[in-house]
């Protein structure tokens, strides 16, 4: 085991504070509409330019082990906030720095660190309750656009795209962000249920120009197993032919003889038919087939349910207004499933999302939910250079998370004002002793930090701005850093999601409180490099 170096009390806190400051100073330069960019060197490819706090924090690694510990703890604040709320990472870092600084001063002057932490926790709980009480539910699409615009660093185009995407696919819909091949940013919305399986044979194509199968008002046969011959399917095929409607077969696979027979019948013109593989694998495949069945009011033909292919009737087949099948994907539009059944299935999937502990499972469940509930929107981010596209994509990701958070828990005035106004809740906080009261006052001062930093990044004097804001008591009265004007921030469209503000404060206080109570730090001693071997002297060669 390598030898360790230990630092105690003031010396430990000073080292830690230096690390916190180095990381926070790099991150906080990005805060607000007039925040600057940070350039990050990459070991391969062009440097990355970003204004995303967590991306900056993740790149910082300090040489001094003790300073690095402080920096890594604050990096954890940014990562945690990013994971939960998706935005607000810079605000969380600024708050953590302010609480650690004030807390370290109080500990050095002889306060009890544990009581300080209890005071900090009491204050945070009171402010969070005040924020929740003042949060406004999102009432229209323009507010979603405003949240997106603020989060994307004042880029109104991104805000507009996000609002449009959420309007089209609903709050449960999936919105994905990709890099475009062109200089333009564009939005593509896929309505209905789409899954990533295409036609099994190009001979099924009905629209040769676009190389796709297009069916109006088809029947849909949903089969869990492979189809290797059509003998057992003949009764249902004959019934479909008599109805003169197209038929889509979704099965684990359609092989050899069965596929050849379907293709021959299609080419001879007697049968409008297409076959695709079922989406997903294993248990997820079963669940997705059930989803398709509920969406189209069909039945999954499964031997587990005791249904044999020979006994299938037309009323067991699903129906949809339109089906479009391309080489790589299939889209079912306007399935004829009952609204109550679909809502029941959506509620069931939401419950599974709440219960699951796996991020991968949660992502897959969210996708299934979106396909049932609304659709999928893809925002393709364009730019003149790869560096620009990556920087813009970071901002779109932030804005997307912020708009989702806003829909979830409502909105608050932006610009750091919500935290400033929520301070009035601290007057009613009861503490057990003077040291806890100092802990409460640490938070009272620390929550000014985001508003000060936004002002300073915009070239104004933070203390003057905060002083002017304190003169007024209206909750939404603040300073717009973009225009330099005072007024109602709701009316000016300067708004933050309540979830982002709340999470930033809770995560910052959680880690900062632990840093304040640190009394000793332990790190491995740096290894001394062994001296190089002596060169052979004259007359010593063998």
Curated annotation (Swiss-Prot):
InterPro entries the record matches: Chaperonin_Cpn60_CS, Cpn60/GroEL, Cpn60/GroEL/TCP-1, GroEL-like_apical_dom_sf, GROEL-like_equatorial_sf, TCP-1-like_intermed_sf
A Pfam family this chain is assigned to: Cpn60_TCP1
Tagged with keyword Nucleotide-binding: yes
Xref: PROSITE patterns: CHAPERONINS_CPN60
Cell compartments where the protein resides: Cytoplasm
Coiled-coil zones: none
Alphabetical keyword list: ATP-binding, Chaperone, Cytoplasm, Isomerase, Nucleotide-binding
Predominant cellular place of this UniProt entry's protein: cytoplasm
Keyword field contains Magnesium: no
Gene Ontology biological process terms from the UniProt entry: protein refolding
Catalytic activity of the protein: ATP + H2O + a folded polypeptide = ADP + phosphate + an unfolded polypeptide
Binding residues annotated for ATP, in chain numbering: 30-33, 51, 87-91, 415, 496
GO molecular function annotation: ATP binding; ATP-dependent protein folding chaperone; isomerase activity; unfolded protein binding
One GO cellular component term: cytoplasm
EC number, as in UniProt: 5.6.1.7
Cited SUPFAM superfamilies: GroEL apical domain-like (SSF52029), GroEL equatorial domain-like (SSF48592), GroEL-intermediate domain like (SSF54849)
Function, in words: Together with its co-chaperonin GroES, plays an essential role in assisting protein folding. The GroEL-GroES system forms a nano-cage that allows encapsulation of the non-native substrate proteins and provides a physical environment optimized to promote and accelerate protein folding.
Similarity annotation: Belongs to the chaperonin (HSP60) family.
Assembly mode: Forms a cylinder of 14 subunits composed of two heptameric rings stacked back-to-back. Interacts with the co-chaperonin GroES.
Descriptive protein name: Chaperonin GroEL 2
Gene source species: Rhizobium leguminosarum
């Amino acid at each position: 085991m390598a030898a360790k170096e230990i630092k105690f009390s003031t010396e430990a806190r000073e080292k830690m504070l230096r690390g916190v400051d180095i990381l926070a100073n790099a991150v906080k330069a990005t805060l607000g509409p007039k925040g600057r960019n940070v350039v990050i060197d990459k070991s391969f490819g062009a440097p990355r330019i970003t204004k995303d706090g967590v991306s900056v924090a993740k790149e910082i690694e300090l040489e001094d082990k003790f300073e690095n510990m402080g920096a890594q703890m604050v990096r954890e604040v940014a990562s945690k906030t990013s994971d939960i709320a998706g935005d607000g990472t810079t605000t969380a870092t600024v708050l953590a720095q302010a609480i650690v600084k004030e807390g370290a001063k109080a500990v050095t002057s002889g306060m009890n660190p544990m009581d300080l932490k209890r005071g900090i926790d009491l204050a945070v709980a009171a402010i969070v309750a005040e924020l929740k009480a003042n949060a406004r539910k999102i009432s229209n699409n323009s507010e979603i656009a405003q949240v997106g615009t603020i989060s994307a660093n004042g880029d109104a185009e991104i805000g507009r795209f996000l609002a449009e995407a959420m309007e089209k696919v609903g709050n449960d819909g999936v919105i994905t962000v990709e890099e475009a091949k062109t200089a333009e940013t564009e939005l593509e919305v896929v309505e209905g249920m789409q899954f990533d399986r295409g036609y099994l044979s190009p001979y099924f194509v009905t629209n040769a120009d676009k190389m796709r199968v297009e069916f109006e008002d088809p029947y849909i046969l949903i089969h869990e197993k492979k189809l290797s011959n059509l003998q057992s399917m003949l009764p249902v095929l004959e019934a479909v032919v008599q109805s003169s409607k197209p038929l889509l077969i979704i099965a684990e696979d359609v092989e050899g003889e069965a596929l050849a027979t379907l293709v021959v019948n299609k080419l001879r013109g007697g049968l409008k038919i297409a076959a695709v593989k079922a989406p997903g694998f294993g248990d997820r495949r079963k669940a997705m087939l059930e989803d398709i069945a509920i969406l189209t009011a069909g039945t999954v033909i499964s031997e587990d349910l005791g249904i044999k292919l020979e006994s299938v009737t037309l009323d067991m087949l699903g129906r949809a207004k339109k089906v479009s099948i391309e080489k790589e994907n299939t889209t079912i539009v306007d399935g004829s499933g009952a609204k109550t059944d679909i809502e029941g299935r959506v509620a069931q999937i939401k419950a599974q999302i709440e219960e699951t502990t796996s991020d991968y499972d949660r992502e897959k469940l969210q996708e299934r939910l979106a396909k049932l509930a609304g659709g999928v929107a893809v925002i393709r981010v364009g730019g003149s250079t790869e560096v620009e596209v990556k920087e813009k994509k970071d901002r779109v990701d932030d804005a997307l998370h912020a708009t989702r958070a806003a829909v979830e828990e409502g909105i608050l005035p932006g610009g750091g004002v919500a935290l400033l106004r929520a301070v009035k809740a601290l007057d009613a906080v009861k503490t057990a002793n003077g040291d806890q009261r100092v802990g409460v006052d640490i938070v009272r001062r620390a929550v000014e930090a985001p508003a000060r930093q936004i002002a300073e990044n915009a070239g104004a004097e933070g203390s003057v701005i905060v002083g002017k804001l304190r003169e007024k008591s209206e909750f939404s009265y603040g300073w717009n850093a973009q225009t330099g004007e005072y007024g109602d921030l709701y009316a000016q469209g300067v708004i933050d999601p309540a979830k982002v503000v709340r999470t930033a404060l809770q995560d910052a206080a959680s880690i900062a409180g632990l840093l304040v109570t640190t009394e000793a730090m332990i790190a491995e001693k740096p290894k001394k490099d062994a001296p190089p071997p002596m060169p052979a002297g004259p007359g010593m060669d063998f």
